[in-house]
Curated annotation (Swiss-Prot):
PANTHER family membership: UVRABC SYSTEM PROTEIN C, UVRC/OXIDOREDUCTASE
Name of this chain's protein: UvrABC system protein C
Source organism of the structure: Bacillus cereus (strain B4264)
Classification via CDD domains: GIY-YIG_UvrC_Cho
HAMAP family assigned to the protein according to its UniProt record, in alphabetical order: UvrC
Keyword DNA damage applies: yes
Length: 594
């Protein structure tokens, strides 16, 4: 531990507040809150921890703290600090997990819509629904029963919905505000749990229509009743008071937390939300951070009541979220909390089973590879491969594996710029120089291990640039192939020594995946460039086709094969003048030319 950390730990206050952990670049990597700052912050640097917390602690070189006047103030401040710094070790709930709602618009002639984008407008929203199908089934039923406007714009004549009796045609007829209000009130009553009353009213109308011998109308009403029964049968009633509530449960194991939320609407359990994330705080603190972020998501309405497990301070939740929070001791609510807890525990068990299987292939394989090479665990591996088939369009590619998995956003492609002809060694020197010069300039992460797809010459070329030109000392290994071009072994060190791996070991399989992936990425890039050059050379002799039109054709068609299959009209659609389109078509279909 750094000496200045010991000094700062010694003077921590025993008051509530937030703390900000920083790495060697001064970047905030974790934000936490505590009832007693002194106890919580010191706990990171004492005692035993799980692997994830050890990794966090291993990156901490400094920290700051902010004292607050209460736990509630610390909770609010923590959420704001997380939003401000976006620390990599904090929970970051995604905003893309949204549920569908039925919306009654606030337009003069209102409409019914399905939306996942809940806005603070004057529209009325009902939901969330468990899935899009459920929402669409309910809307379809309401469309049949209540003739609100269906069209987005006002057409100048009536549409099919009017003739089907599902629209009052405000586009050509006067529909008063009172008429719309009556329909909207009926829809609201239905969506607020009054479907039984609506069903009874429809049943009465059906019998009246039968007595008047209006059998077509009676059949239509009977079908509407059947649709109501079918939809409502799918939603099981679990609470009789019809209160909208969210029921929370959680489980913690091996440094991970799972939170399950049951959405109860109008007495029915309609959906659940499952979130899993690493936790570095006490479970209660982690849960409070989660629930704060949960309701910041625009798709999560605060219900009338929130039900939390017994270990959570419900009064703090109530003050924090400004909504009624309960901690049930018995009854159906307690049963639901226990069910949510149980589901959370099962979800974690399943996750760890899958993690164990995945880790054998990834992080454990990475750890074993590091031990075989005599280096620290290479959490980030970058691999290079050249491709210059037939000496044309020489390229190189770099891929990255983080924790044993491909990190495709980190992949890079390189056109060889300074090397004339097929020279693998010089190409490798150029690419390594470009990659790590830029990494140093942009202060981007450096790898723990570099793998060069090649033998001693490739390794020597890359090492020379890395160490003698750039002053970087990163472990580097050459990936040697056998006579069948398959992974054989690694070479490392000066002079390079072979490192033989068990062929049925996970670290060997990891190297095979890296080799296959970097080769695939390089060869795909090479083929793309080669394909472009083939098209361009095929177009060189066509009158009226310059560089600009070549690029347009290449972008539009993508391949010479598609161009040869295209009609004159398709060349015109691509932006070619009619006479040029005819020239291209004639040239490409001339068998003597191609």
């Amino acid at each position: 531990m750094h000496e200045h950390l010991k000094e700062k730990l010694a003077i921590l206050p025993d008051q509530p507040g937030c703390y900000l952990m920083k790495d060697k670049q001064g970047t905030v990597i974790y934000v936490g809150k505590a009832k007693v700052l002194k106890n919580r912050v010191r706990s990171y640097f004492t005692g035993s921890h799980d692997g994830k917390t050890l990794r966090l602690v291993g990156e901490i070189v400094d920290f700051e703290y902010i004292v607050t006047s209460s736990n509630l103030e610390a909770l609010i401040l923590e959420l704001n600090l997380i939003k401000k710094y976006d620390p990599k070790y904090n929970i970051q709930l995604k905003d893309d997990k949204t549920y569908p709602f039925i919306k009654i618009t606030a337009e003069k002639q209102p409409r019914l819509l399905i939306t996942r984008n809940v806005k603070k407008d004057k529209g009325k929203y009902f939901g969330p629904y468990p899935n899009a199908q459920s929402a669409h089934e309910t809307k379809k039923l309401l469309d049949r029963m209540y003739p609100l406007r269906k069209c987005t714009n006002m057409p100048d004549k009536v549409c099919l919905y009017y003739h089907m009796g599902q629209c009052l045609a405000p586009c050509v007829k006067e529909v008063t505000e009172e008429q719309n209000k009556e329909i909207v009130d009926e829809i609201i009553k239905f969506l607020n749990g009054g479907h039984k009353e609506v069903r009874s009213e429809l049943e009465i109308k059906m019998y009246e229509a039968s007595e008047k011998l209006e059998f077509e109308r009676a059949k239509e009403l009977r079908d509407q009743i059947a649709h109501i029964d079918a939809i409502m049968e799918k939603q099981k009633m679990i609470m009789s008071d019809l209160v909208d509530r969210d029921v929370f449960g959680y489980a913690v194991d091996k440094g991970w937390m799972c939170v399950q939320v049951f959405f109860v609407r109008k007495g029915k359990l309609i959906e659940r939300d499952v979130s899993m994330f690493p936790i570095y705080d006490e479970p209660e603190e982690g849960f409070l951070t989660f629930i704060g972020q949960f309701y910041e998501n625009s798709s999560h309405f605060k219900p009338k009541e929130i039900v939390v497990p017994g270990s959570i301070d419900s009064e703090l939740v109530e003050r924090f979220l400004e909504v009624e929070a309960t901690q049930p001791k018995r009854g159906k609510k307690k049963d639901l909390v226990e069910l949510a807890n149980k589901n959370a525990k099962i979800a974690l068990e399943e996750k760890f089973y899958l993690i164990e299987r995945d880790e054998e292939r990834t992080i454990k394989a990475v750890d074993h590879l590091g031990k075989q090479l005599g280096i620290e665990t290479p959490y980030r591996i970058e691999a290079f491969d050249n491709s210059n088939i037939q000496g044309t369009n020489p390229v190189s590619a770099m891929i990255a594996f983080i924790d044993g998995k491909p990190a495709k956003k980190e992949y890079r492609k390189y056109k060889i710029k300074t090397v004339q002809g097929p020279d693998d060694y010089e190409s490798m020197r150029e690419v390594v120089r470009r990659r790590y010069t830029r990494a140093l300039k942009e202060n981007s992460p450096l790898p723990d291990l570099i793998i060069i797809d090649g033998g001693k010459g490739h390794l020597a070329a890359a090492s020379d640039i890395l160490e003698n030109e750039l002053g970087l000392y990163i472990p580097m290994a050459g990936l040697v192939k056998d006579d069948k071009h398959k992974t054989s072994h690694l070479i490392i060190g000066v002079p390079p020594e072979p490192v033989m791996l068990e062929r049925n070991s996970q670290e060997f399989y990891l190297l095979q995946r890296i080799q296959d992936e970097v080769h695939r990425f390089a060869i795909t890039f090479h083929r793309q460039l080669h394909g472009k050059s083939v098209i361009q050379s095929a177009l060189d002799d066509i009158p009226g086709i310059g560089d600009k039109r070549k690029k347009v054709l290449l972008k539009h068609f993508g391949s010479l094969k598609k161009m040869k299959e295209a009609s004159i009209e398709e060349f015109v659609e691509a932006g070619m003048p009619k006479n040029v389109a005819e020239t291209i078509y004639t040239y490409l279909t001339d068998k003597k030319t191609l």
